[in-house]
Amino acid sequence: MCIRDRIIRAIPLPPISIKKGPVPICPPNRQVKSFFDKIGSTIEIKNEKLSINFWSTSGMMASYYEMLRVMSNWLVKKGIKKQDAQKYITSLFLALSEDAVVNSKKDLKHLVKESQTPKGLNHQGLNTMSKKGVYKSVVNTLNSIHKRLSQ
């Protein structure tokens, strides 16, 4: 439980080791924010109840890495050297993530729309994954993690 001005809850996630990524803190505190801003991007959360929403999304890190691994392995099975496959996939997703950060003041649906052309490859990928329920599964997983944290 966050107690104003006495206990500040902070959860620096593993990418902090490379001085990247968010550090949610609860409740907001100028000194703690100043400290964590030196090693990441501090996100100030008003109360403990709201903070659980952020902690829930941090439970998706392994799923993200698994997606990178699956795509990299798919390239390897298609004859690409493992090192080249991993470099391509990780570089692609780094660029996409950096683009998302640069455009983070815009609604993310803008990036979804701008990254596809009608009947193009990205349109096909998005529609196939939508029809297979991939994004609903992501929401269900987040809800499951949230429920666990709320107990």
What label would you give each PLM region?
Residues 1-3:
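Short, small-residue-biased leader/transition segments that mark boundaries at the very start
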Residues 5-6, 21-55, 59-105, 144-149:
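Internal alpha-helical scaffold of NAD(P)-dependent oxidoreductase catalytic cores
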Residues 16-17:
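Conserved catalytic-site region of short-chain dehydrogenase/reductase
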Residues 30, 90, 94-151:
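NAD(P)-dependent Rossmann-like dehydrogenase/reductase catalytic/cofactor-binding core
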